[in-house]
Structure formats: structure tokens, C-alpha cells
């Protein structure tokens, strides 16, 4: 049983100064009326208190927030008697276990979860008033004894609840134990207070005090120091503990400090790759084990290596137990499926979804539903980088040989040369129709016009002071590498969207990279045609991280570029981020990238076929594409018409299987007004924003975050993707808050210059010297002082 006193925390500032007292009690009550949602979660997640209760004020927290509390360390909810209906709602509607909801009855809260104890109002004490004397009084007021000597039977256990010994306590020893925070008892043989370890050095840190169910015995939870509790130098007065997991942890901690260099355990600690490999090996052997004996044997091996990893990283079994305790408290649990790489892949026929191809529908007032709808897929950055890093390093070190090896491995094509040099052979244009040439020529010309208009024609000059002329002028980035994805679609449009601005900006060398076709080892003739039109010098016949690495570092036949641009899958993006941060590469990138996305805002007057076609044109990019429709005052009839149009059009598309899977996680969000819809769009920051609303042009001024905007019913995203003239290389994953889409300036850098006359030096020189002196940079100051002295602009004795 815990002590009947319940410390109340109404501000976290008081916690640190009183932490040791609360730890001794083992329970705490968080004041929900004073603490914020964030403060409650911070405390319950981070602080190791066995019992964390929360007083729940009426109406302050949403259902989702309350569930989050219970899922993250709050054990019980204390509810005032007048709010009994709240308790009913939690139990009946949210399926919160009844024992975790404590309703006040006659001024008493009867806690039933984890520990059974009644807490009266007078025992709920502000943490600010908590003191050692108060704790001593509570312990002595709770425990009783029928022994003639007035001593209290005391069981001493360690932090793992293992019995160390049976001793006795007196009132004075209890007071001293609380005062010192140490294991202090009463010695019957010496007839005096006994501070454990005072002479032997085997002391104890006191962690918690509690009583048994009848309050006639005490339990001290302690952290034992040095060799053990018993005078015979064993951990327990009942003999040594069985080795077990705690014993193994103790042994490994010792081995971490003193294992010989040639020992296997030392090798494991020194070689993390070996340790990780052994954990995976033993885990696999455990899954293959049969029968009780073999299973227990393989589990023991796995525990050994897992514990070695914990010890090597300063993680204790207690830390693991705390996590298990936290998970035990959860009232909602994960689905529990294994990661795809650990389960057999179902056949394609089994993967196909069935039924109508419809979007989910949520109201804007449903905050949880909206948050789910606007949430982007989680990028497993660390896992992806773990796969990408070796590829980059191998290409960097081995050049073409590594590139050819990866092309054969990942693209299924065995090449003798990874580079196609200009002028490109005629055979690479086979299959290119005149109709396609005309379409590409029109698109190239429109993109050229729009991007040429962005090209600065004059140097920017500003005279900031008389005689101080500042200027800024553009220069092309000399060598650029343009990544053209392959995969599930041929994308000559990406080639022209990147190649044309590079040509307009007058980059000296343009290098394409695109994965070769498995059928013949070539890239599509459309991509080669665009490469020729924009003056590309080379096409690297490779994709993925290996292509990025080849352009970033250069190989025997591939020039090192200064900037890499272009979309790609998560491996391409990870590789771009890697080389951008590697000073050896000295290579920048255009922007981070994620799955393609569209947000359409439509009202009751929107053409349902137009809306459906815009949604589907994005959905066919891939199953991870983001497709969101924000409806403004849509009727039920209109919503159904849109759903029907999506279904009927989708069935006509060759990539219907991809579309079906994408639409399965896509959503219609219903708003009450245009401003609310635009606010939601700005929060999401879509790659593509389509406005299919009345007077669409009037609302463009409300757009703050978007890659590109498509205004009005007759402006489908497809036009911007191919031929209108704007660029389709746009920021995704919410990066439209910080990044622009590709443009002419993307392929340029801007250099500043200044030209200062003697008059100008006189006007700004004293300011320069003043600031330089303050910063302690005398060299900077002297560079101005010497010039001004020679010009006679300052006295010779100027300091």
C-alpha cells in the first residue's frame, strides 16, 4: 500500500525542489485546472513516479487529449462528484477502464488502479508544503506495531523488488531515513540507530517507503551500493540471487569496465556492427526454434546480445521496465502489424482493393480527422540513410565500376559504359513521333518564354551613401546535374522543366541522369530529344542514389557538378540531402522532396468532372501521392456526384490500381467558407493548389503557401505540368512554406560588389571603425583607418 498522502502539483517549477519527497511517497496528483496539456504530457512521460493521477476539470481537455494522457503515463483520472457524467462518458463512450476513473465520494477519492488507496481531501497536499517532517508524520501515522519494543518490521527490497533482507525500524530511524534519503534502520543487537553502510561502505539510497495491506509492516525500496546488503557480502541476507537478467546486466556492466581486450564481450562492445549482426542472427534463430528447450535456449542468447547493446548505450533494465509500464497504461493500442520487410509479400491479386473508388469525408470541425487527412506519410529517414550511405560512398570511391554494378543490381541492366555523350546517336531517337516532337517543342518554347522573362537584364545598383555604390549581378551556376526519374512513368516533362531554365540561365554544362530501360538499356527517346534541345553534354545511364553520387563527386567519365536538381524517390532525396551536407562534394541541391500532392478547393458550382479529373491526375503518380479536396459549402448531393465521377473516371485509367490505392487514403474536407478553405490550404502548403471556385482569381491574394496555383475551372494542373510555361519542379511535403519552385534564379547565384570613393570612405569609415573596435577586430579597423589617414580624413593622433 502507498501512503495516504497525495502531493498536488499545480506548477512544474515546484517539482525539482520537492522531487525527492514525492519519490519517497511514490505518487502524485497533477492539477489539470492549472497545468497545460503539454505540461501534463511532459511530466507523465519524463518523470519516474509509480502513480501519476490527474485531477480532470470539466470541459478543459478534449477526448483525444484525455486518451493521450492515459496512453502516456497518467494512471488514474480524479473527477469531482459534480462531474460524474464526465466519468460515464469516459467509460461508456471512450472505453476507458472503469478502475482508472476515480469519482469523488463524500470528499474521498478511492483509487483502484495499480494501488488501492483512499485519498481524502485533507490528504491532498500542495507539493510546495511538502516537507521531511510532514512525510515522517504521515509514515508514523499510517504504520502500527504490536511488538513490545515498539519496532516496526521492515522489508528491504531493491529497485527490481528483490528482497535484500528483513530488518526493524524505530520512529527515530524512520525520521532519519527520510531526512538523509538513505537506508537507516534500528539495530536490536546494538540497541541503536543503524545507518546502513556507515562502516562497511555498503550503503543504500532510499527510493520509496510504503506499507503492507494491514499497515503493520514497512517496505523500503532502495538502491544497494557496492557488494551487497548482507554482512556476509552477498546481495541478500537470504543468499545470492539467481543470475537472471538483472545478474546478467550487472555482469555486463562490470565487463564493460574491465573485460580484457581479447575477450569476446570486449569485441562486442567495441564493434557495434558485429553486435547488431548478432542480435539479428539470434532473433532469426529464435523465430525458427521449435519446442520449449530450443525456444528457451535461443531466447537466452538473444537476451544476452540485446542486454549487451543496452549496457553499451547506458540503458538499464529499469529503463526498459519503465517503458513496459508506460505501454501497460495505454488504453488504445496500435494495430500491431509487422513492418512490410518482415512479412511475406502478398500476391498482386490479393493486394488489389475492391469496392467504390471514393475519398473519405471529414468536416473541418473534426480536428482529429483533419489532422489525419493533412498528415503526410512519415519519412523513415534513418533507415533510408542506412541503405543509401554505403551506395554513395562506394560510387565516390570506385567511380564507374560501382555505378555499373548498381545499375545491374537495381535497374536490371548490364552496361559497359554508364554515360551517353552528345551528340547523341540516332538509334536513341527511335520511336519518337512527329506529334511528340511538336508537343515537346511547344512546351519547351513556352517554358523558355516564361523563364527568359525572369532573367535579369541589368545589374542592380544602389548608391547607399554619396560615393558608396553597391551592386548585385547574376552568374550562372557552371555545371548542373539534372535527375530525370524513371520508375512507373516516363517523364520527358521533367527533363524540359529542368533543362530549359538551365539553358536560359546559360549554365556552361548540363548533365542529365536517368535510369536505363530494362528492355534495351536505353533511356526514352523523348528524354534524349529534350537533352539535345537544351544542349546537355551527357546523359548518365543510372538512377537512384548512385546517379546522384556520380554527379556530386564525379567519376572517370562523369563531370562533378555544382548543383543537383530534380525529383525522385526517397532514396534519391536522401542521397541529395547527403551530398549537400558533405564538404567533399561541394554540391548544392534544389530542394527536399516528398511524394507528389494536390489540394483542390471546390465549391457547389464546380464541375464535378473537372474536380474528379484533377484529383485523379495526381493520384496516378503513385500510391503515396497526397490528394485532398477542400469543399466549400458542398451539399450531400454534390459530394456524392464528385465521388461517382472519381469512381467512373478512375476505372477508365490504365493506372487504376495505383489510383485505387492512392484514393483509399485521400480525403474530402468540408469547410463553411472560402477563407477557412484557404487558411487550411496555407497550413498544408501544397505542391499544387487548384482553385475551382467562383471568382477564383479574387482569392489568389489569400494564398501564402503553395508551389504553384491553378486558377479557375479551365486551368488543370496538367497544363502546368507540361506546357503552360510555369515550372512543375515544385516543393512538396510542406516545404512550400520555405522554398520556391524551380525557376531561372534556381540555376544562378547572385554576386554583390561595392565601389567606394574617397568621399564614400569619409561617409562610412568612422562607422566601420567604431563597430570593428567594439568587436575587437583591429585588423578590420586598421584597413579603414590607414586609408582615411592617407586621405587626410582623420587626425594623425586619432585613436
UniProtKB/Swiss-Prot annotation:
So where does Zn(2+) get bound?
618, 621, 721, 780
Can you tell me which residues form the catalytic site? 687, 688
Q: Which domain of life is it from?
A: Eukaryota
GO CC annotation terms, alphabetical: cytoplasm
The answer to whether the entry has keyword Zinc is: yes
Induction section of the entry: Induced by amino acid and purine starvation in a GCN4 dependent manner.
GO biological process, alphabetically ordered: L-histidine biosynthetic process
Pfam families membership:
Histidinol_dh, PRA-CH, PRA-PH
Q: Per the record, which residues fall in region Histidinol dehydrogenase?
A: 313-799
Additional observations: Present with 521 molecules/cell in log phase SD medium.
Q: This chain belongs to which protein, by name?
A: Histidine biosynthesis trifunctional protein
Q: Which gene encodes it?
A: HIS4
Amino acid at each position: 500500500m502507498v501512503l495516504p498522502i497525495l502531493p498536488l502539483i499545480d506548477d512544474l517549477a515546484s517539482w525539482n525542489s520537492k522531487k525527492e519527497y514525492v519519490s519517497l511517497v511514490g505518487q502524485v496528483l497533477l492539477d489539470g485546472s492549472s497545468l497545460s496539456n503539454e505540461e501534463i504530457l511532459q511530466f507523465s512521460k519524463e518523470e519516474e513516479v509509480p502513480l501519476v493521477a490527474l485531477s480532470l476539470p470539466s470541459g478543459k481537455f478534449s477526448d483525444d487529449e484525455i486518451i493521450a494522457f492515459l496512453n502516456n503515463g497518467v494512471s488514474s483520472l480524479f473527477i469531482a462528484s459534480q462531474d460524474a457524467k464526465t466519468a460515464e462518458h469516459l467509460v461508456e463512450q471512450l472505453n476507458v477502464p472503469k478502475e482508472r476513473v476515480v469519482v469523488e465520494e463524500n470528499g474521498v477519492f478511492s483509487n483502484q488502479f495499480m494501488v488501492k488507496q483512499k485519498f481524502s481531501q485533507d490528504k491532498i497536499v500542495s507539493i510546495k508544503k511538502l516537507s521531511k517532517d510532514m512525510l515522517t508524520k504521515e509514515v508514523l501515522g499510517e504504520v502500527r506495531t504490536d511488538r513490545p519494543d515498539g519496532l516496526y518490521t521492515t522489508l528491504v527490497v531493491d529497485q527490481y523488488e528483490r528482497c535484500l533482507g528483513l530488518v526493524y525500524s524505530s520512529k527515530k530511524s524512520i525520521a532519519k531515513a527520510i531526512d538523509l534519503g538513505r537506508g537507516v534502520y534500528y539495530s536490536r543487537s546494538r540497541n541503536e540507530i543503524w545507518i546502513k553502510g556507515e562502516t562497511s561502505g555498503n550503503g543504500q539510497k532510499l527510493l520509496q517507503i510504503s506499507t503492507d495491506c494491514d499497515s503493520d509492516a514497512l517496505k523500503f525500496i532502495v538502491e544497494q551500493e557496492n557488494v551487497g546488503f548482507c554482512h556476509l557480502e552477498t546481495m541478500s541476507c537470504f543468499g545470492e540471487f539467481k543470475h537472471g537478467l538483472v545478474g546478467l546486466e550487472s555482469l555486463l556492466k562490470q565487463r564493460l569496465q574491465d573485460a580484457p581486450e581479447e575477450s569476446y564481450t570486449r569485441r562486442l562492445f567495441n564493434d557495434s556492427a558485429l553486435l547488431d549482426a548478432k542480435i539479428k542472427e539470434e532473433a532469426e534463430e529464435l523465430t525458427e526454434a521449435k519446442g520449449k528447450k530450443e525456444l528457451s535456449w535461443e531466447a537466452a542468447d538473444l537476451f544476452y546480445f540485446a542486454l549487451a547493446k543496452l549496457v553499451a548505450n547506458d540503458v538499464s533494465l529499469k529503463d526498459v521496465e519503465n517503458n513496459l509500464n508506460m505501454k501497460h497504461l495505454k488504453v488504445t493500442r496500435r494495430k500491431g502489424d509487422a513492418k512490410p520487410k518482415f512479412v511475406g509479400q502478398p500476391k498482386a491479386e490479393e493486394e488489389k482493393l475492391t469496392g467504390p473508388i471514393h475519398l473519405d469525408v471529414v468536416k473541418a470541425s473534426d480536428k482529429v480527422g483533419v489532422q489525419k487527412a493533412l498528415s503526410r506519410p512519415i519519412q523513415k529517414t534513418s533507415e533510408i540513410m542506412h541503405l543509401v550511405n554505403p551506395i554513395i560512398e562506394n560510387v565516390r570511391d570506385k567511380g564507374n565500376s560501382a555505378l555499373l554494378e548498381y545499375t545491374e543490381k537495381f535497374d536490371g541492366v548490364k552496361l559497359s559504359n554508364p554515360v551517353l555523350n552528345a551528340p547523341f546517336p540516332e538509334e536513341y531517337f527511335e520511336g519518337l513521333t512527329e506529334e511528340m516532337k511538336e508537343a515537346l517543342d511547344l512546351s519547351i518554347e513556352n517554358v523558355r518564354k516564361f523563364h527568359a522573362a525572369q532573367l535579369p537584364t541589368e545589374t542592380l545598383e544602389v548608391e547607399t551613401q554619396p560615393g558608396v555604390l553597391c551592386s548585385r549581378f547574376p552568374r550562372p551556376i557552371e555545371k548542373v546535374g539534372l535527375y530525370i526519374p524513371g520508375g512507373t512513368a516516363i517523364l520527358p516533362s521533367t527533363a524540359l522543366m529542368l533543362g530549359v531554365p538551365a539553358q536560359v540561365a546559360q549554365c556552361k554544362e548540363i548533365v542529365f541522369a536517368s535510369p536505363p530501360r530494362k528492355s534495351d538499356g536505353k533511356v526514352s527517346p523523348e528524354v534524349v530529344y529534350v537533352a539535345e534541345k537544351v544542349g546537355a553534354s551527357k546523359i548518365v545511364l543510372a538512377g537512384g542514389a548512385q546517379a546522384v553520387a556520380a554527379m556530386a563527386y564525379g567519376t572517370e567519365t562523369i563531370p562533378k557538378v555544382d548543383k543537383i536538381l530534380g525529383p525522385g524517390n526517397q532514396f534519391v532525396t536522401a542521397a541529395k540531402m547527403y551530398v549537400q551536407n558533405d564538404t567533399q562534394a561541394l554540391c548544392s541541391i534544389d530542394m527536399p522532396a516528398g511524394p507528389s500532392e494536390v489540394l483542390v478547393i471546390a465549391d457547389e458550382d464546380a464541375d464535378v468532372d473537372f474536380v474528379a479529373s484533377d484529383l485523379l491526375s495526381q493520384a496516378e503518380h503513385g500510391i503515396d501521392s497526397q490528394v485532398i479536396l477542400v469543399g466549400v459549402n458542398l451539399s450531400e448531393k454534390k459530394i456524392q456526384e464528385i465521388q461517382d465521377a472519381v469512381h467512373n473516371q478512375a476505372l477508365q485509367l490504365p493506372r487504376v490500381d495505383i489510383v485505387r490505392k492512392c484514393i483509399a487514403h485521400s480525403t474530402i474536407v468540408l469547410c463553411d467558407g472560402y477563407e477557412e478553405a484557404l487558411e487550411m490550404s496555407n497550413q498544408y502548403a501544397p505542391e499544387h493548389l487548384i482553385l475551382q471556385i467562383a471568382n477564383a482569381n479574387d482569392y489568389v491574394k489569400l494564398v501564402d503557401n503553395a508551389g504553384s496555383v491553378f486558377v479557375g475551372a479551365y486551368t488543370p494542373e496538367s497544363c502546368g505540368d507540361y506546357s503552360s510555361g510555369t515550372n512543375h519542379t515544385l516543393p512538396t511535403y510542406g516545404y512550400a512554406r520555405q522554398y520556391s519552385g524551380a525557376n531561372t534564379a534556381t540555376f544562378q547565384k547572385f554576386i554583390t560588389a561595392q565601389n567606394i570613393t574617397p568621399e564614400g570612405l569619409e561617409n562610412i569609415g568612422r562607422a566601420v571603425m567604431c563597430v570593428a573596435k567594439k568587436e575587437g577586430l583591429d585588423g578590420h579597423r586598421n584597413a579603414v583607418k590607414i586609408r582615411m589617414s592617407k586621405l587626410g580624413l582623420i587626425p594623425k593622433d586619432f585613436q
